[in-house]
């Protein structure tokens, strides 16, 4: 049984009701609908018919009017469409620049149906904007509205406006063009008034020169009526009168500027007038007398004595010699005095030149340096250094970077001993966070605990069990690839204690991040899997903790597994100096299970116990100092740095210097994603507001003066830039001999990369891993390595340099993928580091030329010889393998190769065959060898191309 459907607008026609009234009835009856074209069931339609009998439509009066005058029925619709027409606010943009009486016109424009009222602007302009406010006045225009109903449906496309301006026939085309221009330049709308459009266009061109001179005029003479034209800055420079009015108010210095500018900008459009004006300027500067200046300034300034005197004093220096005796005397005396001073200076300098310090006998260098820097250090001319290198067979320029060995060689020739400065170990723990002034205000602070260990030994899972959170599920492949800083509240002896945990990566590529974690920590928790034992990253973590002189607590994880052997783990750790307490050592070892949450309380108690022994204190009542744990560039928030406050308190609004970056702290977010106003010692927060992304591991400090912070950051940035340039020059240094030989052999290949990662630590880890790849035949060039998303600028750089873009845990900006497809740029995205390294190594191997490898086919023995007209045929017996026609063969006689050629003919039982297997006899003929003997061995082989690996390529060289 089908149910009938009725559309709402059909029902409205049937009931002679407006759609809005019918929709209102649907709302009262609770009937669902989307629009007036929706369908409803017959039952609902019957309900509506019953309700319509008693319904009093609120639009009854308009419907009655509509019967008498149909255009009025559509009057409410234009009120809605007026909002759409009002979007085209170009006419409003014209009015603010027009005279004040036009400001009253915009309220009349939003109502296009009232167009016939616009042609009477003189008197009715003011009352008619007030008329649309009332709802009743639309009745009088109902008589002339028979004409508007036709253009009413076309209100959105603007045919109604030309009807309004039919009186101005010539003004109709410009507004349509100007409707597109106003969004770019609202001033362009002035062109609607055609008689003044041309003048204003010329004005805009000449408005540039006098513009700076007029703002000062406005302040001193606010009451003058002539100040109204200055908004139109153009007409002022053309006539001389407005210029004289402006100069009256100018300063002393600006008077002379007006004198010069008047001649410079006079007749700006004509070249001849430029030359004349420039000549006049020169004549004014060189020849004009004080009396002539007085006449000129009287014309311009109205004989203002003060400004004339000032202009005279300003124009005195460029004057040539004048017959007045006073002026030439003073400059002559000055020149004599100045010459005497110069001579005395030269006399003073002459004895100082030979008094220079003698060359040093001992120098200390920090690394490679340029020839110019070496010459400055040893106090010798650059030419002498270059000559010394030339005699040693090294052609160098003044800006070339020299290796430490080369510097020692040059210094030895000059009789100077060289000492190389030792770099500080990065893993040493920072202890200078506390100053002597902090000793009187120390307070106990929470411990910073770093969880370290081999990859997949359960570090993050252990931290999850402590935090009761699922952090490991968010890491790609279950591998931690950042330093995560987490704040945990631990209950111990009925009291709440706070502990800050740092979760470091265990993958081998993240060595620098583990070293950084050990450097800022107070306690290191070494996680070792009970079923896996001590692994390479476990040993590395032990060395980092020992270098930082940090106490180590060993957590033997995964004891719930059947293959767990905790005692074997303890035995292995003793080989690296970690002896458990029960064996007489001083290392705390706790067997735990992160999944089963076993012995976690014991581990936390041990952490708090060691923290009490360490006496961890800080001064919270001072500006903050600490270390940048991690940093990255966020698409929405900008540079974001994870800071660990080690001393003092960091507050919102502080001026911060982190390495070579500085900024003001705009916001701080803790590990739970909540905004905080202050971060006390031992707390890690994300900080927003830095100008650039700082390097992970940099120390930060809060300063009170922004200028000092900026200067310190710029100084550090300059030092980093110099060291980076020196390292880049040293890394790309190639001798001429090796360069030419590699170029001849075609072995000089480069793979250009652009690396973008989520955080700075990932960038460091990937760069370190890439540098460990063999680069004997394929050199890796990282053109750009930075945190942040992949942008169109990166794509343009890759397209220009034929580079591959590598994205690690990052995204693409809008338009980057489209630009990459347009420029055929390869973008690779990864979230696990070892997959990235495998692909890069594969790409490098693909650039190597394939190797030609001999593949053995078989051997045959010559047992008979048959001379024929075409040549000598050797009757052979295949010993092993097979013989293939057209394969390469070697003929061995008494273990020596006597011929190498191609097997041109192969027959068996007088039939040509393609191959003969082992155990069969065959006839063999070679085109270029006929001296067969019985007992010769035929060695058959073929050459195949094989992809070369980086290891094999390096071994071959």
Swiss-Prot record:
SUPFAM superfamilies: Initiation factor IF2/eIF5b, domain 3 (SSF52156), P-loop containing nucleoside triphosphate hydrolases (SSF52540), Translation proteins (SSF50447). It holds the Pfam family IF-2. It comes from the Bacteria. Its main location: cytoplasm. Residues 107-161, 209-242 have a biased composition (Pro residues). PROSITE patterns: G_TR_2, IF2. Residues 444-617 form the tr-type G domain. Residues 503-506 are annotated as: G3. CDD domains: IF2_eIF5B, IF2_mtIF2_II, mtIF2_IVc. Residues 557-560 are annotated as: G4. It is found in: Cytoplasm. Residues 34-282, 311-367 are annotated as: Disordered. Residues 478-482 are annotated as: G2. Keywords: Cytoplasm, GTP-binding, Initiation factor, Nucleotide-binding, Protein biosynthesis. Belongs to the TRAFAC class translation factor GTPase superfamily. Classic translation factor GTPase family. IF-2 subfamily. One of the essential components for the initiation of protein synthesis. Protects formylmethionyl-tRNA from spontaneous hydrolysis and promotes its binding to the 30S ribosomal subunits. Also involved in the hydrolysis of GTP during the formation of the 70S ribosomal complex. This is Translation initiation factor IF-2.
């Amino acid at each position: 049984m089908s149910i009938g459907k009725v559309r709402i607008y059909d029902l409205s026609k049937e009931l002679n009701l407006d759609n809005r009234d019918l929709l209102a009835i649907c709302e009262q009856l609770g009937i669902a609908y989307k629009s007036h074209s929706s369908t409803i069931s017959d039952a609902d339609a019957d309900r509506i018919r019953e309700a319509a009998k008693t319904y009093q439509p609120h639009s009854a009066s308009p419907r009655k009017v509509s019967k008498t005058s149909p255009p009025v029925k559509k009057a409410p619709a234009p009120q809605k469409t007026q909002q759409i027409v009002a979007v085209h606010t170009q006419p409003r943009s014209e009015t603010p620049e027009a005279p004040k009486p036009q400001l009253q016109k915009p309220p009349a424009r939003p109502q296009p149906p009232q167009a016939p009222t616009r042609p009477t602007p003189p008197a009715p302009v003011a009352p008619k904007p007030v008329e649309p406010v009332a709802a009743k006045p639309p009745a009088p225009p109902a008589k002339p509205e028979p004409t508007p109903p036709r253009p009413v449906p076309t209100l959105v496309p603007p045919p109604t406006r030309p009807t309004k301006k039919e009186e101005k026939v010539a003004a109709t085309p410009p507004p349509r063009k100007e409707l597109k221009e106003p969004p770019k330049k609202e001033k362009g709308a002035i062109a609607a008034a055609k008689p003044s459009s041309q003048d204003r266009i010329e004005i805009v061109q000449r408005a540039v020169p006098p513009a700076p001179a007029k703002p000062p005029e406005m302040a001193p003479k606010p009451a003058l009526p002539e100040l109204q034209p200055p908004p139109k800055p153009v007409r002022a420079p053309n006539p001389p009168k407005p210029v004289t009015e402006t100069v009256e108010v100018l300063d002393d210095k600006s008077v002379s500027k007006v004198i010069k500018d008047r001649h410079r900008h006079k007749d700006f459009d004509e070249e001849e007038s430029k030359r004349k004006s420039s000549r006049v300027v020169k004549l004014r500067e060189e020849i004009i007398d004080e009396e002539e200046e007085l006449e000129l300034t009287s014309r311009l300034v109205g004989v203002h004595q003060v400004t004339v005197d000032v202009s005279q004093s300003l124009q005195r220096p460029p004057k040539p010699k004048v017959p007045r005796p006073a002026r030439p005397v003073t400059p002559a005396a000055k020149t004599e005095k100045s010459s005497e001073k110069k001579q005395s200076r030269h006399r003073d300098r002459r004895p100082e030149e030979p008094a220079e310090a003698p060359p040093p006998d001992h120098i200390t260098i920090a690394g490679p340096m340029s020839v110019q820097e070496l010459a400055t250090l040893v106090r010798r001319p650059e030419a002498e250094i270059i000559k010394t290198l030339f005699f040693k067979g090294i052609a160098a320029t003044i800006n070339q970077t020299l290796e430490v060995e080369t510097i020692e060689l040059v210094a030895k020739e000059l009789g100077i001993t060289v000492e190389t400065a030792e770099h500080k170990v990065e893993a040493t723990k920072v202890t200078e966070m506390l100053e002597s002034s902090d000793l009187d205000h120390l307070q106990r602070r929470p411990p910073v605990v770093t969880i370290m260990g081999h990859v997949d030994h359960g570090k993050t899972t252990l931290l999850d069990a402590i935090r009761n959170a699922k952090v490991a599920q968010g890491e790609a492949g279950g591998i931690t690839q950042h330093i995560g800083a987490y704040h945990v509240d631990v209950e111990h002896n009925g009291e709440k204690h706070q502990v800050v945990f740092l979760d470091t990566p265990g993958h081998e590529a993240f060595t620098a991040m583990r070293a950084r974690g050990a450097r800022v920590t107070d306690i290191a928790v070494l996680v070792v899997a009970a079923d896996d034992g001590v692994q390479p990253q476990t040993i590395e973590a032990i060395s980092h903790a020992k270098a930082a002189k940090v106490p180590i607590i060993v957590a033997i994880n995964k004891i719930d597994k059947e293959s767990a052997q905790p005692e074997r783990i303890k035995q292995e750790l003793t080989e690296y100096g970690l002896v458990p307490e029960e064996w007489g050592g001083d290392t705390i070892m706790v067997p735990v299970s992160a999944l089963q949450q076993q012995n976690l309380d014991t581990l936390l108690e041990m952490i708090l116990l060691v923290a009490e022994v360490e006496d961890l204190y800080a001064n919270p009542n001072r500006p903050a100092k600490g270390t940048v744990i991690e940093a990255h560039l966020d698409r929405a928030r900008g540079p974001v740095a994870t800071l660990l406050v080690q001393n003092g308190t960091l507050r919102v609004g502080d001026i911060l210097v982190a390495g070579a970056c500085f900024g003001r702290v705009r916001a701080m977010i803790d590990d739970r994603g909540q905004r905080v106003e202050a971060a006390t010692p031992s707390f890690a927060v994300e900080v927003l507001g830095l100008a650039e992304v700082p390097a992970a591991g940099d120390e930060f400090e809060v300063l009170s003066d922004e200028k000092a912070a900026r200067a310190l950051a710029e100084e550090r940035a300059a030092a980093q830039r110099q060291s980076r340039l020196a390292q880049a020059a040293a890394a790309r240094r190639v001798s001429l001999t090796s360069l030419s030989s590699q170029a001849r052999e075609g072995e000089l290949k480069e793979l250009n990369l652009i690396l973008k990662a989520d955080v700075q630590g990932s960038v460091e880890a990937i760069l370190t891993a890439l540098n460990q790849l063999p680069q004997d035949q394929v050199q890796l060039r990282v053109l750009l390595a930075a945190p942040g998303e992949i942008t169109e600028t990166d794509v343009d750089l890759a397209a220009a340099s034929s580079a591959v873009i590598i994205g690690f845990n990052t995204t693409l900006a809008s338009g980057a993928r489209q630009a990459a497809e347009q420029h055929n740029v390869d973008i690779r995205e990864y979230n696990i580091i070892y997959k990235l390294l495998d692909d890069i190594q594969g790409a490098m191997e693909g650039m190597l030329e394939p190797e030609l490898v001999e593949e053995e086919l078989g051997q045959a023995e010559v047992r008979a010889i048959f001379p024929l007209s075409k040549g000598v045929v050797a009757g052979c017996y295949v010993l092993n393998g097979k013989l293939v026609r057209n394969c390469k063969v070697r003929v061995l006689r008494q273990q020596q190769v006597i011929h190498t050629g191609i097997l041109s003919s192969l027959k068996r039982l007088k039939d040509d065959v393609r191959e003969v297997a082992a155990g069969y006899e065959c006839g063999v003929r070679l085109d270029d060898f006929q001296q067969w003997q019985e007992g010769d061995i035929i060695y058959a082989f073929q050459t195949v191309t094989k992809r070369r690996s980086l290891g094999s390529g390096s071994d071959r060289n």
